[in-house]
Amino acid sequence: MKVRDVIKALEADGWHFARMRGSHRQYKHDSKPGLVTIAGHPSKDLHPETLQSIWKQAQLGGKP
């Protein structure tokens, strides 16, 4: 799954962009605790374990 697709899924769940440093983007949710960090350029594919970690941070449960 590409970084661009992960960002779209997070934004659809209510996460919004908080800050960026280099290629690391951090997203924040109004009602869920913590931040979700997504590393990489939008056109690049994420490693499956990295994707699983992002879903866990975002409390999304599984694959979209």
How does the language model describe each region?
Residues 4, 8, 13, 32-64:
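C-terminal structural segments of small proteins and small subunits
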Residues 17-20:
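Short beta-strand
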Residues 27-31:
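Active-site beta-strand termini and strand-to-loop segments that position acidic
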